Curated annotation (Swiss-Prot):
The RNAP catalytic core consists of 2 alpha, 1 beta, 1 beta' and 1 omega subunit. When a sigma factor is associated with the core the holoenzyme is formed, which can initiate transcription. It comes from Chlorobaculum tepidum (strain ATCC 49652 / DSM 12025 / NBRC 103806 / TLS). Zn(2+) 2 binds at residues 868, 944, 951, 954. This is DNA-directed RNA polymerase subunit beta'. It catalyses: RNA(n) + a ribonucleoside 5'-triphosphate = RNA(n+1) + diphosphate. Binds 1 Mg(2+) ion per subunit. InterPro entries: DNA-dir_RpoC_beta_prime, DNA-dir_RpoC_beta_prime_bact, RNA_pol_asu, RNA_pol_N, RNA_pol_Rpb1_1, RNA_pol_Rpb1_3, RNA_pol_Rpb1_3_sf, RNA_pol_Rpb1_4. Pfam families: RNA_pol_Rpb1_1, RNA_pol_Rpb1_2, RNA_pol_Rpb1_3, RNA_pol_Rpb1_4, RNA_pol_Rpb1_5. NCBIfam families: rpoC_TIGR.
Length: 1490
C-alpha cells in the first residue's frame, strides 16, 4: 500500500485507498536509511547499534527529544539533526512509523506473486510453478536472449537449460560473450531472481493480451481457452493498473535533506518487474520490538530473526561477489538469500519453514502477522481494547427502574476519575490535579458527593459477551451502590441472555457529548423494548414475575367474600386490606370503561349468586349486559391499578403469553415511556405476589395418574399384536418397527395429557407445579410428562455429527422420574442426556462461525435512498396449511411492508391497501381476518433496484420502531444478527429434553379443517376390497394417481378454503361434491412407505426380477414367511450386463399394458403370474421417517447448507422443460429419462440405477419438477426457474428450519437481505465490445455500467475516406461518427460504415455466503475475512482501489462508519440559532431607525 509522502496516512482526510505492488523507488522513498548490520542492541549498553535493525539514526530516537550521543536534550532542539550521531531530535513515537530498507545484492522474487494460485509470474511468463521454482532456486538456466548461438542451436527464448548445456554453448561461442549485454546477437541465459526480473521487464503486455484474446476467439480446444483465460486475467490486471505516463512529482515533505533530487517521483501503477525485489523494506522497530525480560534476557519479535537472516546472507553474498568467489558458492548463497526473503514474507507457505531454536515452532512472518484471528486485521483493527471500561459479576437489582443499573462505587470512581478531578478543581476543593488525585485515593467523603453530581445524566454502556445482537450492549443511568457487583434490572436479562449464576458484564463510559447523546437516545434500555429480529417485545417478565402475576389474577371458587358487589375499584382494595375479601374471590365491581376479557360474564352470575336470590341475579345480569358491571377477581383489580387508561381493564388470567401480547400492544399504542413505567410496576407486583403466595414445589405436587397402568397394559397388548402379525408374515421388519414406535408414542402422549389434566384439577388449579407450568414461568409439558407420566421413547444418538435422524430405541422407559427408573432404564437414558451436553459445546462454535460469515456478507448493506422506483415486487399468498402447522401467518408476511400493487378484496372488489402504502399492524390484521384477500404483491429487498445498498421502500418498516426504515440504517448487520443470534440459541437448546425422543407420530388420517363442499382435482381412484383387522371385507376407494388435489370450497361463494394434496395409494373417504363437516376424515394414507399401486386389471409379470440377482428372499426365522426385497444387483453381474427390475401388468393374451419399475430396498407384494385388480399394492418402498424432532442439530447444518448454496449430497434430477416423461434405454449403471414437449424439444437425463424415480411413463411435468427423489439443488432452481424462484426457495427453506425445528420467529426481510447478497454477482458469457472478460464474476451493477458504456458507441467496419485517426474495428461514439459522415457527405467522399457495438451477456450466479463475502468489491473487507494473502496479492496486481463504502473497511482504517449518525451527509451540518439571528435582525433594524 503506497501513501504519497506528502499526505501522511495518519491524517484522517482520505476517502479511498489504492493497493499496488511497491516499486523499488517507492520503497526507497519511504525509507529513512539502509540497514547494514544484523545487530539489534549493544549487549553492554543495551542501546541500539548504529546501522543495525534498531538504529536510531534510521528510525528515530528511543527517548523523547534526545539524540543517541546525548549532545541535544530537551524539546527546544526539535528537528535538529545531531552532527555527531546523526539522530534527529524528535519524539520516540516516530519509531512506530519510520521505515528502513535493505539493498539486495541480487534481485529476489516476492513469494506471494510466485506461490499464489494461479501464480502471477507463471501466468505472465507462461511457465508452470514447478519450472519457475527450478529457475528461481538456481537449478536451471532460462534463455533470455537466444542471440546467434541460440538460432544455430535451435534454442528459443524461455527455454530451460541445464548447467552442462549452458556451459557447452558458452565454451563453443566464446567470442559471443564479449558482446554488449543489450546486443541482440548476444546469447544471454540466467537463473534466479535476476533471470525472472529480466524476463518480466522484457514483456510486451499489449501484445500478449492481443494473442490471448485471439486464442479465446478462435481456439477449438476447451483446455487451451481455459488456460488463455487464466493468463489473460493476470495480463489485463497489469495492463489496467499501469499507465507509464502517469508520474506524479512528490510534494516536498521537509523530511528529506536530499528532498529536491529528481528521482523523487512515484510510478502510479504496476510494472511486472516489481514482483521481483531489489530492495526489501524494513518495518519500523516499534512494530517488532525487543522487550527486556527479568534476568537480563530479551524477548524478541520473530521478525527480527527473519530480518537478521536476510541481512547476514545479503552481506555475505556481497563479500563473496567482491572476492570473486566461484559460481557454485555464489549460487548457493543466492539461493539461501532467496529463501531468507521468502521466509520473511511468508514463512507458513513453505514446507521447510524456518523454526525457532528452543520450541521448534515456525517463526511468524509478515504474512502471519496479517492472517487469522490473531492477525493485524481481526486482532487489532476490528477489535481493540477500550479505555474507560471495567468488568464485574452481575447480581439482580429488583428495585431498579428499567433504565437504571447499579454501579459499585469503587468502579464508578475509577471510570469517572477525570470528570471528578475536573469538578474538584473547578469547585476549588482541590488546588491541582495531583491534589485532587490524592483526595480520591483517600476516599474523602466530598468525593462521593462530587461523583453523584458527575454521574447524574451520564449514561454508561453495559455489555455481556457474547454480544450476539445489538441488544447485547445497552445504555443505563448508573446509580451508586455499595459492594463490588453490578446490579442489573431483571427485565433486561432476556436481551443480554444473562442469568445470575456468576455471569460477568463489562461497563464502558461514553466520553464525548455526542456519544453520551447517542447512548441516551438510541441505546437506553427503556428505548429498546422490541426485538429487531421479529418485532416482538423482548422485555417480557419471566419466572418469578410471571408466577406472581398469574397467582394474583387467578380465580378460586368459594374464596372469602365471593359474589360481593363493590361501588368502585378503590373500595375493593380497602376491603382486601381489611381482610373482608380474599385475593382470588370473584366479585362484581361497578365499571363502565373499556374491558378486555375472554369468558362470558353473564354465565358466571349463576355460579356466584345462590338460586334463592333470583331478583339479585336478574338485576346483576341486566347491569352486566348494559356494560355497567364487571365480574372480576380482587387480584385482577389490584393488577389493573397499574394499567394505562387507554388500554382499559384487562379481565384475564395473566400468563407469559398474555403478558407478551399486552406489552406489544402497549408499545405500539402508548409508546415507550408509558410501557417502561408499566413494566416496572408489574415487575414489583410480580415479585411481591410470588413472595406472598409462598409458591414452592415438593415431591407430593407431582401426581402420577392412576390410569397410567391401564394405558401401558393396552400398549403392551398392541405391540404384542404387531409382533404377532410380523410373525405371521404380513408385516416387514421395517413396518413392525415403525408401528411399535407409533404405539408407544401415542401412549406416551396419552399418559402425558392425563397427568397434565390431573395436575390441572388438583387443589382447584392451585397445584404449584401446574401453576409454574401453566403460567409459562418454568418447565414445559414435555418435562411434566417425564416427571409424572412416563419418560417414553429414547433416541439412540448417532456417531455422525451430520445430524441424521437418530434411531429410536423401541423399548420405551415406562417409569417416570417421580417413581424412579430401573437400572436398565437409567442406563438407556444416560446416553441421550450426555450427548445433549456435548452437542451443546460443539455446536456453539458452528453457530458462531455462521454468524461471522453472515456479518461479512451483509455488512455493507445500508439503506441509501428513499425509493428506487422499481415496479417489481414479491407475490405472497395465504397458505392455510402452513398457518395450521404453526408456520408464519399471512399477516406476518405482509406486515410492515410497502404494497407494490393495490391489494384488493376479491369478494367486493374494494381496494384494501393502495400501491406504495405501508401495511401497518392494523391493516395486516384486517387483511388476515378478511378472507376476500388471498394474495398480495409487496415490495422486497430481493427486487430492489438501487445501485448501492437498498432503498427504504423495498425494506419496509424498521421492526423495532414500527416506522419506515431511515436512510443510513445498517440493515445488513441487523439481518446477520437476527439470523445468527437464534442460531446460537438453538444449539444450546438440545439437552433440556434429556435425550427423550419427540415428535414424529406420522398422521395417517387427514381431517377437514373447515366445513364445506369437497372438490376433487385430478384425483383418479378405483374401488378395491380389503380385509380389515377384524377380518371383515370392506370396499375402499384407492387413489391411483399422483399429485391429485382435494379442495374444500365454500358452497356460497365458491372460494377455496383449503387445499390438500392426496398421496398416491391413499384411501379416499369422500366423493366429489359431498358436503363435509369440520374434523371429518377425508382420506387416510400410510405414512411409513410409498406404495406402488396397480391402475388396471391383468396378471403380474416379473421382468428382470431374479432370485439372488435382483432380489433376495428373506425367510423370517421367527415366522417362516418369505419376504422379497429388491437388492442392488450391480455387484452380482459382469460389467457388460444390466438389469432393470420391474413388474408389468399383462393382459390374458400376454400384451404388456403398463410397467412399474421397482427401486432398490422395496418389498414386493405380488407373485409372478398373480391376478391383479386395480388398487392392488404391487410393492412398498420404505420411507426413512425423521422421527427425532426438536433437536436443531439437524437444523444448523441444514441452514449452513442453504446459506452456502451447496449442492445436496444426493440431489434430485430436475426437469428443465415442461413436457411428458418417457423412459429410454437402460445401461449398466443408469437408465435414461426423456422429457419431450409439444414443440419437439427434448431433454435426456441419466438416473443411477436404484434411485427412486418419481415420474412414470407418460406423466406431465413442469419445468423445475423433480423427476427422482432427493433434495432439489438451489443451483438447479436458478438455472431452470430463474433468480426469483431460487430467492423465494432459499428464504422459505431457511424459514422452515427456524420455524419448525426451533419455533424461532425471524422476519422474512432479514433472510431476504442475505439472499440478495448471494445473488449480487453475474458471470459474463459473451463480453461483446465491453472490456469484460468471458467467465468474469462481477457485480450486477458493474455489468450494467459496462453495457451502458458501449450503448452509445459503434464499431467501424469500413473507414471509407475517414481521417487517419479512425481505425477499422475500433469503437467510437455514435455522434462523433455521425458528425464525420455529415462532413464526408458534404465533400462527396465515401462514408464510414458502422455497426452498433455489441453488449455483453451474462447469467446470474448464486454464491454461498463465504464466497460472496470474499468476492466483495472492498479489498480490506475481503482481506479481513479469509484468505488474507490471496486477497491482498490479487488486489495489488490489479491496482484495486477501496472506496471505503462498507462498515468494516471504515472500522479498520479508523473512520466513522457510514451508517446511522456516521453518514457522510451529517458530517457537514452547520447549526443555526434562529432566535439569536432574529434578535440580531431586530436590533439591526432598530439601529437603522435610530
Amino acid at each position: 500500500m503506497i501513501f504519497s509522502q506528502g499526505s501522511s496516512p495518519l491524517k484522517g482526510d482520505f476517502s479511498k485507498i489504492k493497493f499496488s505492488i511497491a516499486s523499488p523507488e517507492s520503497i526507497l522513498a519511504h525509507s529513512r536509511g539502509e540497514v547494514l548490520k544484523p545487530e539489534t542492541i549493544n549487549y553492554r549498553t543495551f542501546k541500539p547499534e548504529r546501522d543495525g535493525l534498531m538504529c536510531e539514526k534510521i528510525f528515530g530516537p528511543t527517548k523523547d527529544w534526545e539524540c543517541y550521543c546525548g549532545k541535544y536534550k530537551r524539546v527546544r532542539y526539535k528537528g535538529i539533526i545531531c552532527d555527531r550521531c546523526g539522530v534527529e531530535v524528535t519524539t520516540k513515537s516516530v519509531r512506530r512509523e519510520r521505515m528502513g530498507h535493505i539493498s539486495l545484492a541480487v534481485p529476489v522474487v516476492h513469494t506471494w506473486f510466485f506461490r499464489s494460485v494461479p501464480s502471477k509470474i507463471g501466468a505472465l511468463l507462461d511457465l508452470s510453478t514447478k519450472e519457475l521454482e527450478r529457475i528461481i532456486y538456481y537449478e536451471v538456466y532460462v534463455v533470455i536472449n537466444p542471440g546467434e548461438p541460440g538460432e544455430k542451436q535451435g534454442i528459443k527464448k524461455f527455454d530451460r537449460l541445464t548447467e552442462e548445456q549452458y556451459f557447452q554453448i558458452i565454451t563453443e561461442y566464446e567470442d559471443n560473450q564479449d558482446l554488449e549485454d543489450n546486443d541482440p546477437a548476444k546469447f544471454v541465459a540466467k537463473m534466479g531472481g535476476e533471470a525472472i526480473h529480466m524476463l518480466l521487464k522484457g514483456l510486451n503486455l499489449d501484445e500478449i493480451a492481443l494473442n490471448l484474446r485471439k486464442v479465446l476467439k478462435e481456439s477449438g480446444s476447451e483446455q487451451k481457452r481455459a488456460d488463455a483465460l487464466k493468463r489473460l486475467k493476470v495480463v489485463e490486471a497489469f495492463r489496467k493498473s499501469y499507465e507509464p505516463q502517469k508520474r506524479t512529482r512528490k510534494k516536498s515533505t521537509g523530511l528529506f535533506p536530499e528532498e529536491d533530487s529528481p528521482e523523487l517521483y512515484i510510478y502510479e501503477g504496476n510494472k511486472p518487474e516489481y514482483m521481483v525485489m531489489e530492495v526489501v523494506p524494513v518495518i519500523p522497530p516499534e512494530l517488532r520490538p525487543l522487550v527486556p525480560l527479568e534476568g537480563g534476557r530479551f524477548a524478541t519479535s520473530d521478525l527480527n530473526d527473519l530480518y537478521r537472516r536476510v541481512i547476514i546472507r545479503n552481506n555475505r553474498l556481497k563479500k563473496l561477489i567482491d572476492i570473486r568467489a566461484p559460481e557454485v558458492i555464489l549460487r548457493n548463497e543466492k539461493r539461501m538469500l532467496q529463501e531468507a526473503v521468502d521466509a520473511l514474507f511468508d514463512n507458513s507457505r513453505k514446507a521447510n519453514a524456518v523454526k525457532t531454536g528452543e520450541s521448534n515452532r515456525p517463526l511468524k512472518s509478515l504474512s502471519d502477522a496479517l492472517k487469522g484471528k490473531q492477525g493485524r486485521f481481526r486482532q487489532n483493527l476490528l477489535g481493540k481494547r477500550v479505555d474507560y471500561s471495567g468488568r464485574s459479576v452481575i447480581v439482580v437489582g429488583p428495585e431498579l427502574k428499567l433504565h437504571q443499573c447499579g454501579l459499585p462505587k469503587s468502579m464508578a470512581i475509577e471510570l469517572f476519575q477525570p470528570f471528578v478531578i475536573r469538578r474538584l478543581v473547578e469547585r476549588g476543593i482541590a488546588k491541582s490535579v495531583k491534589s485532587a488525585k490524592k483526595l480520591i485515593d483517600k476516599k474523602d467523603p466530598v468525593v462521593w458527593d462530587v461523583l453523584e453530581k458527575v454521574i447524574d445524566g451520564h449514561p454508561v454502556l453495559l455489555n455481556r459477551a457474547p454480544t450476539l445482537h445489538r441488544l447485547g450492549i445497552q445504555a443505563f443511568q448508573p446509580t451508586l451502590i455499595e459492594g463490588k457487583a453490578i446490579q442489573l434490572h431483571p427485565l433486561v436479562c432476556t436481551a443480554f441472555n444473562a442469568d445470575f449464576d456468576g455471569d460477568q458484564m463489562a461497563v464502558h463510559v461514553p466520553l464525548s457529548p455526542e456519544a453520551q447523546l447517542e447512548a441516551s437516545l438510541l441505546m437506553l434500555s427503556s428505548h429498546n423494548l422490541i426485538l429487531p429480529q421479529s418485532g416482538k417485545p423482548v422485555t417480557v417478565p419471566s419466572q418469578d414475575m410471571v408466577l406472581g402475576m398469574y397467582y394474583l389474577t387467578k380465580a378460586r371458587f368459594g374464596d372469602v367474600g365471593q359474589g360481593q358487589l363493590f361501588y368502585s375499584m378503590e373500595e375493593v382494595i380497602i376491603a382486601y386490606n381489611e381482610e373482608r375479601v380474599g385475593l382470588h374471590a370473584q366479585i362484581f365491581v361497578k365499571y363502565d370503561g373499556k374491558v378486555d376479557q375472554v369468558s362470558d360474564p353473564v354465565r358466571l352470575v349463576d355460579t356466584l349468586v345462590p338460586e334463592e336470590q333470583a331478583e339479585r341475579r336478574a338485576w346483576l345480569k341486566s347491569q352486566i349486559e348494559q356494560k355497567k358491571l364487571l365480574v372480576t377477581t380482587v387480584g385482577r383489580v389490584i393488577f389493573n391499578q397499574h394499567m394505562p387508561e387507554e388500554i382499559g381493564f384487562i379481565n384475564k388470567l395473566i400468563n407469559k403469553k398474555v403478558a407478551k401480547e399486552l406489552i406489544a400492544q402497549l408499545s405500539s399504542e402508548v409508546g415507550n415511556v408509558e410501557t417502561a413505567r408499566f413494566l416496572d410496576n408489574i415487575k414489583e407486583v410480580g415479585f411481591d405476589y410470588a413472595m406472598r403466595g409462598g409458591l414452592s414445589i415438593g415431591l407430593s405436587d407431582a401426581i402420577v395418574p392412576e390410569t397410567k397402568v391401564k394405558h401401558i397394559k393396552n400398549a403392551q397388548r398392541d405391540s404384542a399384536k404387531i409382533i404377532k402379525e410380523y410373525n405371521r408374515g404380513t408385516l416387514t421388519d421395517n413396518e413392525r418397527y415403525n408401528q411399535i414406535v407409533d404405539v408407544w408414542q401415542k401412549t406416551s402422549n396419552l399418559v402425558a395429557d392425563e397427568s397434565y389434566e390431573k395436575l390441572k384439577k388438583d387443589r382447584d388449579g392451585f397445584n404449584p407445579l401446574y401453576m409454574m407450568l401453566d403460567s409459562g414461568a418454568r418447565g414445559s409439558r414435555e418435562q411434566v410428562r417425564q416427571l409424572t407420566g412416563m419418560r417414553g421413547l429414547i433416541a439412540r444418538p448417532q456417531k455422525s455429527m451430520s445430524g441424521q435422524p437418530g434411531e429410536i430405541i423401541e423399548n420405551p422407559i415406562i417409569s417416570n422420574l417421580k417413581e424412579g427408573l430401573t437400572v436398565l432404564e437409567y442406563f438407556i437414558s444416560t446416553h441421550g442426556a450426555r450427548k445433549g451436553l456435548s452437542d451443546t459445546s460443539l455446536k456453539t462454535a458452528d453457530a458462531g462461525y455462521l454468524t461471522r460469515r453472515l456479518h461479512d456478507v451483509a455488512q455493507d448493506v445500508i439503506v441509501t435512498i428513499d425509493d428506487c422506483g422499481t415496479t417489481r415486487g414479491l407475490h405472497v399468498e395465504r397458505n392455510i396449511e402452513e398457518e395450521t402447522s404453526g408456520q408464519i401467518k399471512f399477516r406476518e408476511k405482509i406486515k410492515g411492508r410497502v404494497a407494490a400493487r393495490d391489494i384488493v378484496d376479491v369478494i367486493n372488489d374494494k381496494v384494501v391497501v393502495k400501491a406504495g402504502e405501508i401495511i401497518t399492524d392494523e391493516l395486516a390484521a384486517a387483511i388476515q381476518d378478511n378472507i376476500g384477500v388471498e394474495e398480495a404483491e409487496i415490495r422486497s429487498v430481493l427486487t430492489c433496484e438501487s445501485k448501492v445498498g437498498i432503498c427504504a421502500k423495498c425494506y419496509g418498516t424498521n421492526l423495532s420502531v414500527h416506522k419506515l426504515v431511515e436512510i443510513g440504517e445498517a440493515v445488513g448487520v441487523i439481518a446477520a444478527q437476527s439470523i445468527g443470534e437464534p442460531g446460537t440459541q438453538l444449539t444450546l437448546r438440545t439437552f433440556h429434553q434429556g435425550g427423550a425422543a419427540q415428535g414424529g407420530i406420522a398422521e395417517t388420517e387427514t381431517k377437514a379443517f373447515y366445513e364445506g363442499q369437497v372438490e376433487l382435482e385430478d384425483v383418479k381412484s378405483v374401488e378395491h376390497s380389503i380385509i380389515t383387522e377384524d377380518g371383515i371385507e370392506e370396499t375402499r376407494q384407492i387413489v391411483i394417481q399422483k399429485n391429485g388435489k382435494l379442495n374444500i370450497i365454500d358452497p356460497d361463494s365458491g372460494k377455496v378454503l383449503k387445499r390438500y394434496v392426496v398421496p398416491h395409494g391413499a384411501h379416499l373417504n369422500v366423493e366429489h361434491g359431498q358436503m363435509v363437516r369440520k374434523e371429518q376424515v377425508l382420506f387416510s394414507s400410510e405414512p411409513n412407505s410409498t406404495q406402488i399401486i396397480a391402475e388396471m386389471p391383468g396378471f403380474a409379470k416379473f421382468i428382470d426380477i431374479e432370485k439372488g440377482v435382483t432380489y433376495k428372499e428373506e425367510v423370517d426365522p421367527q415366522t417362516g414367511f418369505a419376504q422379497h426385497t429388491i437388492i442392488n444387483w450391480r455387484s452380482k453381474l459382469r460389467a457388460s450386463e444390466t438389469r432393470e427390475p420391474r413388474v408389468a401388468i399383462v393382459s390374458e393374451s400376454g400384451e404388456i399394458r403398463k410397467t412399474y419399475p421397482v427401486p432398490i430396498k422395496s418389498n414386493l407384494y405380488v407373485e409372478d403370474g398373480q391376478k391383479i385388480v386395480p388398487g392392488d399394492i404391487i410393492a412398498k418402498v420404505p420411507r426413512n421417517l425423521d422421527r427425532v424432532g426438536g433437536d436443531i442439530t439437524a437444523g444448523l447444518p441444514k441452514v449452513t447448507e442453504l446459506f452456502e448454496a451447496r449442492i445436496p449430497t444426493d440431489p434430485a434430477i430436475v426437469s428443465e422443460i415442461d413436457g411428458y416423461v418417457s423412459f429410454g434405454s437402460q445401461r449398466r449403471s443408469s437408465k435414461e429419462i426423456r422429457v419431450k414437449n409439444d414443440f419437439g424439444e427434448e431433454k435426456v437425463y441419466y438416473v443411477q440405477v436404484g434411485k427412486h424415480v418419481l415420474a412414470t411413463e407418460g406423466d406431465e411435468v413442469k419445468a423445475g419438477d423433480p423427476l427422482t427423489d432427493g433434495a432439489v439443488s438451489p443451483q438447479d432452481i436458478l438455472r431452470i426457474q430463474g433468480p426469483n424462484a431460487v430467492q423465494q426457495y432459499l428464504v422459505n427453506e431457511i424459514q422452515k428450519v427456524y420455524q419448525i425445528n426451533a419455533g424461532v420467529e425471524i422476519n422474512d426481510k432479514h433472510l431476504e437481505v442475505i439472499v440478495r447478497q448471494m445473488l449480487q454477482k453475474v458471470r459474463v458469457e459473451e463480453p461483446g465490445d465491453t472490456d469484460l472478460l468471458p467467465g468474469d464474476l462481477i457485480d450486477r451493477s458493474t455489468f450494467i455500467e459496462a453495457n451502458e458504456a458501449v450503448a452509445e458507441k459503434v464499431r467501424v467496419i469500413d473507414r471509407g475516406d475517414a481521417p487517419a485517426r479512425i481505425i477499422e474495428g475500433q469503437l467510437y461514439k455514435q455522434r462523433d461518427i455521425t458528425k464525420l459522415n455529415r462532413e464526408l457527405r458534404r465533400n462527396g467522399k465515401s462514408l464510414i460504415t458502422i455497426e452498433p457495438a455489441l453488449q455483453a451477456t451474462s447469467h446470474p450466479v448464486l454464491l454461498g455466503i463465504t464466497s460472496a463475502a470474499l468476492q466483495t468489491e472492498s479489498v480490506i473487507s475481503a482481506a479481513s475475512f479469509q484468505e488474507t494473502t490471496k486477497v491482498l496479492t490479487d488486489a495489488a496486481v490489479a491496482g484495486k482501489v477501496d472506496h471505503l463504502v462498507g462498515l468494516k473497511e471504515n472500522v479498520i482504517v479508523g473512520k466513522l462508519i457510514p451508517a446511522g449518525t456516521g453518514l457522510r451527509k451529517y458530517r457537514s451540518i452547520r447549526l443555526r440559532d434562529n432566535e439569536a439571528e432574529e434578535a440580531e435582525a431586530v436590533e439591526a433594524a432598530s439601529d437603522e431607525e435610530i
